[in-house]
Regions:
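Hydrophobic faces of well-ordered beta-strands that scaffold small-molecule active sites
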Residues: 10-14, 42-44, 69-75, 98-104, ...
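C-terminal helical cap(s) of enzyme catalytic domains, especially alpha/beta-barrels
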Residues: 110-122, 182-193, 268-289
Length: 317
């Protein structure tokens, strides 16, 4: 193991969309906690919001209650509503002052990477090779994002989604259980990005890992630490203490297997608090993760340049 692309600074994100009581108020509380730890961004998905407002609406409520942490709702558009979704995400980017992203969801398992790219990054292949917002397709200039386009997040775990990630993602998430697998897919994604004319250094690849930190302060339970977390039907799971999780994060990043982690707390309040005050604090103490936000936008948190307009399309998309 040891990617030929090397490694940059560590990036950390957390999901705050697990099933908890309390609605958007709890989401605000969790986002503030993540911000206290200087995490790059939080994700908000349907699991949190049902039967309440959707992920975009919840994120819009969180935006004025936070000042730095990135906000990434899961956005699933059907064929008849991509313009509405783009406008809503652009509005979130505006009200959050550049902190918005969008996790490109798919309407169903039958949707392949090409359909994802065409449907959710609708302007790509429609006359603009950069995936930029088209003024003519938006309701007004006020709904266009102020930073080119919000950060795009794609789950690239499955092979068929990796082409879309290489073409248009700013952040690719991988649900993998060992560092060698993560390293191989990261290299594949970066090679793919370079192959379509992108700078591979403008793509962040994060391992998405469910975490259960209810088992003590230090050791991971058997099969959950060391070479990797345990595989489960819901994705890779780490179960143990915050200290051992910090060691796992540091080891994988040091080896160049990943640019960072998207951590999904099994019990949001308990696990996110232990993650921020335990795992993240230890990484900060060791100089492995930042202690403050040097910038104000999500692109700055991720070390990405301004949104580019050169992404190459293919396959008639």
């Amino acid at each position: 193991m040891g990617s030929s692309y090397g490694r940059g600074r560590l990036h950390l994100a957390a999901a705050i969309d697990q099933r908890v009581e309390g609605g958007a108020e709890v989401c605000v509380e969790l986002a503030r906690l993540a911000e206290r730890g200087a995490l790059d961004f939080v994700t908000v998905g349907d699991a949190f919001t049902r039967p309440g407002p959707d992920a975009l609406a919840v994120s819009a409520q969180v935006a004025p209650e936070t000042g730095r942490v990135g906000l990434v709702p899961v956005v699933t558009a059907t064929p008849d509503e991509p313009c509405r979704v783009r406008a809503a995400v652009a509005t979130l980017d505006r009200v959050s002052r550049g902190r918005a992203g969008w996790w490109l969801g798919t309407p169903g398992p039958e949707e392949g990477a090409v359909q994802v790219r065409a449907r959710h990054v609708g302007s790509v292949g429609a006359g603009d090779a950069g995936g930029a917002w088209h003024p003519a397709r938006q309701a007004s200039a006020g709904t266009r994002p102020q930073h080119g386009h919000p950060v795009r997040v794609v789950d690239a775990t499955e092979g068929e989604s990796r082409g879309a990630a290489a073409h248009c993602a700013d952040v690719a998430l991988l649900r993998v259980a060992d560092p060698d697998h993560a390293d191989a897919v990261r290299t594949e994604l970066r090679d793919g990005a370079a192959g379509v004319g992108r700078d591979p250094d403008e793509l962040r690849v994060l391992v998405s890992l469910r975490v259960d930190l209810g088992g003590g302060e230090y050791a991971a339970e058997p099969g959950h630490g060391g070479g990797g977390p345990r595989r489960t039907a819901d994705g890779p799971l780490y179960r143990g203490g915050p200290v051992a999780l910090a060691e796992l994060i540091a080891d994988w990043h040091r080896a160049g297997a990943t640019d960072g982690f998207h951590l999904v707390p099994v019990e949001p309040r308990r696990d996110l608090e232990r993650l921020v005050n335990g795992t993240v604090a230890l990484l900060q103490h060791r100089g492995l993760f930042r202690t403050f936000y040097p910038g104000s936008t999500l692109r700055e948190h991720l070390g990405l340049g301004p949104a580019q307009r050169h992404i190459v399309t293919g396959g008639g998309v």
